[in-house]
Design a protein with these regions (language model features):
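Beta-strand-dominated extracellular/periplasmic modules and repeats
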Residues: 2-282
Length: 282
């Protein structure tokens, strides 16, 4: 029976009734849960009209701050712990496989591809010289040749997109026949997530610091394997236990040491998870 005079008790049921004919079952499931939780949130918090409009403005501003070089919504998701929760639920690495973590808002498609051993840092480099090397294998220890490593990091003065520069401190490398990779970059440094937008204001308002521990981003792909999005973190960084985006996992913490040439050096081996299709075919 149609209802015109809704109240606090009847409104939610009517909103849910109106999406009953949603043809996509997954969309219906998601929207049903979203409506229930959103209405429950409003009942619990009981925002005033002004407070509700403040929330609407925050989301509107978050959209305005997002573009092809910066994703403020990802930053919001990261700093609220939602990105890591999605990661936990969807990428559960089995024993021996490399753990994933958040992608973050600063990945840029179309990074230049370099030969192994090349330097992703412009001259002069924005930081201390560093060499990173390792191997990519499957769970059985077999090297994966031709795997693509899309890497990116911040310099001492921020990410390239924050400085308005052309691509710097990012690039794509491919493993050799033995699954090995090596490249030059700068030693990762700790840095603040952007504080000039709505997410930065949210952190300030809630008494949180914006710092991320020093790390290097990796997005690793290879045919027959799930894409791995992860970091390696610098051992000893003071923000490892209070990462603003909750992204640290102990298995990803790496010791960076000086080599004989006075450069920083780190080594890390990645183990990829076979794709669902590959597991079915096995």
């Amino acid at each position: 029976m149609a209802i015109r005079n809704f109240n606090e008790e009847t409104l939610t049921a009517e909103v849910l009734r109106r999406i009953e004919d949603t043809p996509d079952p997954r969309l219906k499931e998601v929207m049903t849960s979203l409506i229930k939780h959103l209405h429950s949130f409003v009942r619990e918090v009981r925002p005033t009209p002004d407070e509700w409009m403040t929330g609407i403005k925050f989301l509107t501003d978050t959209g305005h701050w997002s573009d092809d070089k910066r994703q403020e919504f990802i930053l919001m998701s990261d700093t609220l712990g939602v990105s890591m929760l999605v990661d936990f639920l969807n990428y559960q690495a089995k024993a021996g496989m490399t753990e994933s973590t958040v992608q973050g808002p600063f990945h840029r498609p179309g990074a230049p591809e370099y030969p192994l051993g090349a330097n992703v840092a412009k001259d002069p480099p924005d930081g201390e010289p560093c060499v990173v090397r390792g191997t990519i294998r499957n769970a059985k220890g077999k090297p994966i040749a031709g795997a693509a490593l899309d890497i990116w990091e911040t310099g001492v003065h921020g990410y390239d997109v924050q400085k308005g520069d052309a691509m710097d401190l990012r690039g794509i490398f491919r493993t050799d026949a033995e699954g090995k990779f090596w490249f030059r970059c700068v030693k990762p440094v700790s840095y603040p997530v952007p504080e000039d937008g709505p997410v930065g204001k949210m952190l300030t308002a809630t008494g949180r610091h914006p710092m991320r521990p020093a790390h290097l981003h990796f997005m690793i792909t290879a045919p027959g394997y799930d894409c791995l999005v992860t970091h390696i973190f610098v051992k000893g960084d003071k923000y490892l236990d209070s990462d603003a985006v909750f992204g640290v996992k102990q298995s990803l913490v790496v010791d960076f040491k000086k080599n004989a040439k006075g450069e920083w050096e780190a080594s890390y081996d990645f183990v990829l998870k076979p794709s669902k299709q590959a597991r079915k075919a096995a």
